[in-house]
Amino acid sequence: MTQIVVGENEHIESALRRFKREVSKAGIFQDMRKHRHFETPIEKSKRKKLALHKQSKRRFRT
């Protein structure tokens, strides 16, 4: 769980910015998206295969 301690003279906007930065560092949003819907093993393998294909295309192009 990500926690931010807001200072006494700190603006809420800067605290919110720090919180967003910590959440993105921790990878919480990616994990949330990954677990949003149940994914069957076949769907998971298809997604991984497609990601490998895209990655190899990028490597080949450069």
Curated annotation (Swiss-Prot):
Q: Where is this region: Disordered?
A: 43-62
Recorded GO cellular component terms are: ribonucleoprotein complex; ribosome
Basic residues compositional bias: what residue ranges? 45-62
InterPro entries in the cross-refs: Ribosomal_bS21, Ribosomal_bS21_CS, Ribosomal_bS21_sf
Keywords of the record: Ribonucleoprotein, Ribosomal protein
Recorded GO MF terms:
structural constituent of ribosome
Q: Does the keyword Ribonucleoprotein apply?
A: yes
- Gene Ontology BP, a term: translation
Protein's UniProt keywords contain Nuclease:
no
Pfam families found in the cross-reference section: Ribosomal_S21
Note the HAMAP family from the entry. Answer: Ribosomal_bS21
Family recorded in the similarity comment: Belongs to the bacterial ribosomal protein bS21 family.
* Protein name in the entry: Small ribosomal subunit protein bS21
Q: What is the originating organism of this protein?
A: Anabaena variabilis
